[in-house]
């Protein structure tokens, strides 16, 4: 019998399954607006994911990227992770809505009792996304309503919720602005990050309760989680890279004492918080850039 570790009720366990995204959203926190490459296959990290399923009890799980629908292995992630947490209710795939023409993929996600979190980043995408959602759900007996949500920028917006047998199946949100990310500037193809007070930056981070699993290992946050992907494919200033390379991670096969200590400190600030801004300023995402920035 494995020891079970419980995350706080507000926390998200985020499985990052691809660096690739088809959009160019400025200030994307995981830098997927750049020419990022590589998808991850569930089979490569299956053992670690299954071990997390044995020892970790998260209140919420989100499969994300990048754009998860761009990963040809998405459904293997959906089915595989659902087997790891067969009874979890708040379990979603987060998408920008531009791949919803893949009706059978969406139905397969819904049939695994995950819900689809559609986060639109350009008003011009709305009509087509809604049409694809309604086509996807046409084979089910569904109901829908509208609520008011708040995103990580504290902006309020309408959420269109679709339910099957009382269970959330799709949420359509208009997220047309992002807050600042860890980029202070890009100069001569080098990404320079902030030098903030880490405590203040952490307190003001809207994603501080989103903990990332990347290549099967657990990280404090999105930036520490993607740091190897980022520094392998792009040039980051030397001071920031050095700090990122010191990021802690937790392998599910680590000694139980190490896992307990790591999870117990998940909600605390880390030295890498200094790389994010102390204050986040909202910026409209649209019109989206026509091509990804080459740096």
Locate each region found by the language model.
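Short catalytic/ligand-binding loop motif for oxyanion handling, primarily in non-cytosolic enzymes
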Residues: 35-36, 70-72, 101-102, 124-128, ...
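Exposed alpha-helical structural elements
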Residues: 44, 132, 258-261
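Short loop/turn segments at strand-loop or loop-helix junctions that form parts
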Residues: 16-20, 29-30, 120-122, 216, ...
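Conserved AdoMet/S-adenosylmethionine-binding subsite of the radical SAM
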Residues: 71-209, 213
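Soluble or luminal CAZymes and related metallo-dependent hydrolases
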Residues: 9, 40-44, 73, 128, ...
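Extracellular structured ligand-interaction cores
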Residues: 10-12, 113, 207-208, 270
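Conserved alpha-helical substructure of the radical SAM core
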Residues: 1-95, 100-105, 112
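Accessory C-terminal segments flanking Radical SAM cores
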Residues: 182-295
């Amino acid at each position: 019998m494995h020891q079970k570790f419980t995350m706080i009720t507000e926390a998200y366990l985020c499985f990052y399954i691809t660096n690739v995204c088809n959009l160019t959203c400025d200030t994307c926190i995981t830098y997927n607006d750049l020419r990022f490459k590589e998808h991850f296959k569930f089979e490569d990290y299956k053992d670690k994911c299954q071990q997390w399923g044995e020892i970790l009890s998260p209140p919420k799980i989100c499969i994300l990227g990048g754009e998860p629908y761009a990963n040809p292995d998405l459904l293997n992630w959906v089915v595989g992770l659902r087997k790891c947490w067969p009874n979890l209710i708040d379990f979603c795939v987060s998408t920008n809505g531009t791949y919803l023409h893949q009706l059978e993929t969406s139905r397969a996600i819904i049939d695994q009792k995950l819900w689809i979190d559609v986060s639109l980043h350009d008003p011009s995408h709305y009509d087509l996304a809604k049409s694809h959602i309604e086509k996807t759900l046409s084979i089910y007996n569904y109901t829908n309503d509208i609520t008011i949500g708040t995103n990580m920028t504290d902006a309020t917006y309408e959420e269109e919720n679709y339910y099957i047998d009382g269970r959330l199946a799709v949420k359509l949100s208009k997220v047309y602005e992002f807050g600042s990310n860890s980029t202070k500037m890009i100069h001569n193809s080098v990404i320079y990050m902030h030098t903030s007070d880490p405590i203040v930056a952490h307190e003001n981070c809207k994603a501080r309760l989103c903990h990332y699993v990347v290549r099967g290992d657990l990280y404090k946050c999105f930036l520490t989680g993607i740091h190897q992907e980022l520094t392998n494919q792009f040039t980051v200033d030397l001071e920031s890279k050095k700090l990122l390379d010191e990021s802690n991670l937790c392998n599910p096969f680590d000694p139980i004492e190490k896992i307990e200590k790591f999870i117990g400190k998940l909600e605390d600030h880390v030295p890498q918080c200094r790389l994010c801004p102390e204050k986040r300023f909202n910026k409209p995402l649209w019109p989206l850039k026509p091509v990804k920035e080459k740096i």
